Amino acid sequence: NGKTASTDHVRANMHQRIYLSTSGGSTWTQVGEASPDCAVGAAERPFAAARARRRQGASLEALVHAVLVGACRCIDPQRHQPCRIETLMGAIGLQRRLQAQQPRRCVAFGFTPWKQRNLRRFLAGSQLRFRAPWRRIPQGVDAVVVWGRRAKPRLLEAAARRQLPVLQVEDGFLRSVGLGADLVDPVSWVVDHQGVYYDATRPSDLETLLATQQWTSAQCQRAAALRQRLVQEAITKYNLQAEPWSRPAGQRRVVLVIGQVESDASIRYGAPGLRTNRALLEAVRAAEPQAYLVYKPHPDVVAGLCRAGAGEDAAAQLCDEVLPQGSIQQLFTQIDALHVLTSLAGFEALLRGLEVHCWGLPFYAGWGLTHDRERCGRRQRQLSLDELVHAALIDYPRYVSRDSGWFITAEQAIEELVAWRAAPPQRRTLVQALFRHWGRLRRR
């Protein structure tokens, strides 16, 4: 009737050989001769072959290999290219690990629309609600999220009464190509459950890691390779355009002094002594009277996005040269030492093996790697540079791909920053241009 094979046709083909398909059908393995007794119909032959295959038995390892390696075709979510199953499993595992570390239901206070969009990326997997700073904490939440140290005391007291953890979010140490004050999206943020890394008045997740964590030799080797890649690619926090500068001729010691935004929370909570750029310059000149002092003001101040510090306009009278433009990474190859209050530039200089003097208490001070003018009683441990790097760049931050929106590793973040910096510069959006203009007007 055209729907089933005739009996004569079945019997005529009873003695054909049966083969098994392996490796997705690319090769064939002979099983044996078909028996007339099993020839019930052509439609049953595939099932008979399957039963024959399964009677042969297989180890668990062979089964796993066949299902996950032989039968799967995997695509790297970052590079959009074929990859090994181990690469995909590692990427999926990273998403699950980071999402497991964060509360399920969060309410965030005081985030601008631009930061709200980025917070959704860095807390992917959590349910997020947003509130103005003066609003109350709603019911049915597991945690409160704030930006840095900007939370109102009333909000912190309300969270404490309800025993809700407060997560403090801040920029990571490998952030972007361009300034955050220009609304450039970050590759890295940190989410701290205790404090925040620049606040030396109390512990943070990073300080606890540095004080207690034990790193294996393999982890230290990974940190060393990461550090070498950073130096090789000249990666810094903002990765601004570099301008050539050469140290003056002669044997005079060249010292770089880093300016900061004086209203920054890192000075308020991390500099118990000196707190102004002018005071820092005066102290460094007194400490190094014979050195050639180079002063670099903060890029946000140079761009007009933040106010200059009190008396900072007199910096030229306290140093030998002021360098307002360009990336700091180019200067690292030309100097002998660097002095900071709490600037991240000191950490970047440590990565390059430079002598670093801290007049405040940045997160990298107090571990035996810097020359410190202040002391923190909680920091008693001596660390290697690679241990510091593993904690600060691998354990502590979160990295999110600008392309895929997935959580990524520090190594993958460096790849993205290198490609981002090499790409043609993009024009500012209308929102970015208006924000910059408004910032300049506000600070007049």
Annotate the PLM regions.
Residues 1-444:
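Catalytic-core helical/loop segments in enzymes performing group transfer/polymerization on anionic/lipid-linked
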